[in-house]
Amino acid sequence: MTQASAKFIVVEGLEGAGKSSAIALIRDFIEKHTGLAPVCTREPGGTPLAERIRDLVKIADPSDPLCDESECLLIYAARAQLVANVIKPALAEGKWVLGDRHNLSSLAYQGGGRGLMPLVEAVSNATLKGFKPDLTLYLDLDPKLGLLRAAKRGELDRIEQQAIDFFERARATYLKLASEDERIVVIDASQTMAEVHKDILAVLQAMAW
């Protein structure tokens, strides 16, 4: 495998869309086809500093509520660390990278959900400078169903506790952005897990390996 062949693949989706099982499937597929396990990341998070930022974003503090703009900027601070210190170095070494969320999450959640698209686009351009995944698989699911699934996992975090209209706006933004970028593939996550995995594998098998 050459450096040029290394790819950055991201799995996106609303809460409860099945990202974890999809990531496990893709990780195994990449390892089978390249002989090496991919570098797996999550956002926010993925470096010591970014993980501390993740806690600030995910855990509610009633004594000092996080405002929408701070949430956006913190997430981009974490992302900048991850891209600079993990993702780009791994790709430069010829390693595949598999991400649990990336910039599309901010465009959907903070841009669409929070109504901060001008800020999101400005900070994205300033921090990422056009850096994008080679492929993003967006697991599309009705937010009501997704939140029901998420609730079964246990206590919801600060983001998961947002009102349903927040997630509806985020979903609409995901779908709009997917319609404008051929590198974003929409997967129907309302199907059975076997059907979802079949669709994901079809996308992966169509890639050049």
UniProtKB/Swiss-Prot annotation:
It is an enzyme of class 2 (transferase). The keyword Transferase applies. Pfam families: Thymidylate_kin. One of its GO terms (biological process) is dUDP biosynthetic process. InterPro entries: P-loop_NTPase, Thymidylate_kin-like_dom, Thymidylate_kin_CS, Thymidylate_kinase. SUPFAM superfamilies: P-loop containing nucleoside triphosphate hydrolases (SSF52540). GO terms for molecular function: ATP binding; dTMP kinase activity. Keywords: ATP-binding, Kinase, Nucleotide biosynthesis, Nucleotide-binding, Transferase. ATP binds at G13, L14, E15, G16, A17, G18, K19, S20. PROSITE patterns: THYMIDYLATE_KINASE. GO terms for cellular component: cytosol. It catalyses: dTMP + ATP = dTDP + ADP. Its EC number is 2.7.4.9. It comes from the Bacteria. The keyword Ion transport does not apply. Phosphorylation of dTMP to form dTDP in both de novo and salvage pathways of dTTP synthesis. Belongs to the thymidylate kinase family. NCBIfam families: DTMP_kinase (TIGR00041). PANTHER family: THYMIDYLATE KINASE, UMP-CMP KINASE 2, MITOCHONDRIAL. This is Thymidylate kinase. It comes from Shewanella sp. (strain ANA-3).
